[in-house]
Amino acid sequence: MIPRLLPFFASLLFAALLFPGDIPPGIRNTVCLMQQGHCRLFMCRSGERKGDICSDPWNRCCVPYSVKDRR
């Protein structure tokens, strides 16, 4: 029974290492600042679009419309 479970647990470990999960705290704020944005509570100001979430709960990254997407 153990030899049959070994490949299963090995594949779970591989998946956990391949997809590490969420970004560590504080990094999201830095990413927002690198996009020339500001972390704001709930809503963005006029002339800003809503981006990704920031490290603090409920905060969103607000990026000005003048900054073009680099994708």
Curated annotation (Swiss-Prot):
The entry's function note states:
Has antimicrobial activity against E.coli. Plays a role in the defense response in the male reproductive tract, contributing to sperm maturation, storage and protection.
Task: Recall the taxonomic lineage recorded for the source organism.
Answer: Eukaryota, Metazoa, Chordata, Craniata, Vertebrata
Q: What is this protein called?
A: Sperm-associated antigen 11A
Q: Where is the signal peptide?
A: 1-19
Q: Name one GO biological process term.
A: antibacterial humoral response
Q: Identify the InterPro entries for this entry.
A: Defensin_beta-like (IPR001855), Sperm_Ag_11A_B (IPR007988)
- Keywords per UniProt: Antibiotic, Antimicrobial, Defensin, Disulfide bond, Secreted, Signal
Main subcellular location of this protein, as a coarse class: secreted
Which species expresses this protein natively? Mus musculus (Mouse)
Record family assignment? Belongs to the beta-defensin family.
Q: Which cysteines are joined by disulfide bonds?
A: C32-C61, C39-C54, C44-C62
Q: Which GO terms describe its cellular component?
A: acrosomal vesicle; cell surface; extracellular space
- State its location(s): Secreted
